[in-house]
Amino acid sequence: MRNVSMTQRISEVVRNTNETKIRVRLNLDGTGQGTLNTGVPFLDHMIDQIKQHGLFDIDIHCDGDLEIDDHHTVEDCGITLGQAFAQALGDKKGLRRYGHFYAPLDEALSRVVVDLSGRPGLFMDIPFTRARIGTFDVDLFSEFFQGFVNHALMTLHIDNLKGKNSHHQIESVFKALARALRMACEIDPRAENTIASTKGSL
């Protein structure tokens, strides 16, 4: 019998283009350890939420064309992190598949729902109260999440339900995402050798 719980769910992805050079190492069954160096400090801060609250070990190093702007780096980090999740999840046997979480941060409240469906889809509603957080363009979060879901092969619903401070809004989103991913990626001990789909595949 295959013991899914003892299988190492670890991946390493290298993605090099003319715009970015990225290496990601991911352990789905970690303790929230790792080093983040995307070159964009606010992006590091957000991915740190995934790492800490999801209990994923994540190492990311990116050399990007930041002399142009942050766009390529943010999008490509989302793509590469998504590829790492897809690779680490493997055949998806035993996965709970679904995850959801509500995360508050002071006045902000966000809900994230995840389905490791194999069907990429991003449905996001974050009514940011300002266009930038420090120097970070909030429009880039949609690029990050779109790249992530396209390559992680998941359906992702993101809703910021309340919030006046843009930093609080997006940080509550990443906290909720971390917890929802943690739930969806867990192995169900009652079904560890089956696929959570009536089709028999994800």
UniProtKB/Swiss-Prot annotation:
Protein's cellular compartments: Cytoplasm
- Provide the Gene Ontology terms for cellular component: cytoplasm
Give the record's GO biological process terms: L-histidine biosynthetic process
Family matches, as PROSITE patterns? IGP_DEHYDRATASE_1 (PS00954), IGP_DEHYDRATASE_2 (PS00955)
| One Pfam family recorded for the sequence | IGPD
Q: What pathway does the UniProt record associate with this protein?
A: Amino-acid biosynthesis; L-histidine biosynthesis; L-histidine from 5-phospho-alpha-D-ribose 1-diphosphate: step 6/9
User: Record's InterPro entries?
Assistant: IGPD_sf (IPR038494), ImidazoleglycerolP_deHydtase (IPR000807), ImidazoleglycerP_deHydtase_CS (IPR020565), Ribosomal_Su5_D2-typ_SF (IPR020568)
Instruction: Provide any one GO MF term from the record.
Output: imidazoleglycerol-phosphate dehydratase activity
Q: Which UniProt keywords apply?
A: Amino-acid biosynthesis, Cytoplasm, Histidine biosynthesis, Lyase
**For this protein, what reaction is catalysed?**
D-erythro-1-(imidazol-4-yl)glycerol 3-phosphate = 3-(imidazol-4-yl)-2-oxopropyl phosphate + H2O
**The protein's Enzyme Commission number:** 4.2.1.19
**Superkingdom of the source?**
Bacteria
Which family is annotated? Belongs to the imidazoleglycerol-phosphate dehydratase family.
Tell me which NCBIfam families the record gives.
PRK00951.1-1 (NF002106), PRK00951.1-5 (NF002109), PRK00951.2-1 (NF002111), PRK00951.2-4 (NF002114)
Its name, as the record gives it, is Imidazoleglycerol-phosphate dehydratase
What organism does the record attribute this protein to?
Answer: Acinetobacter baumannii (strain SDF)
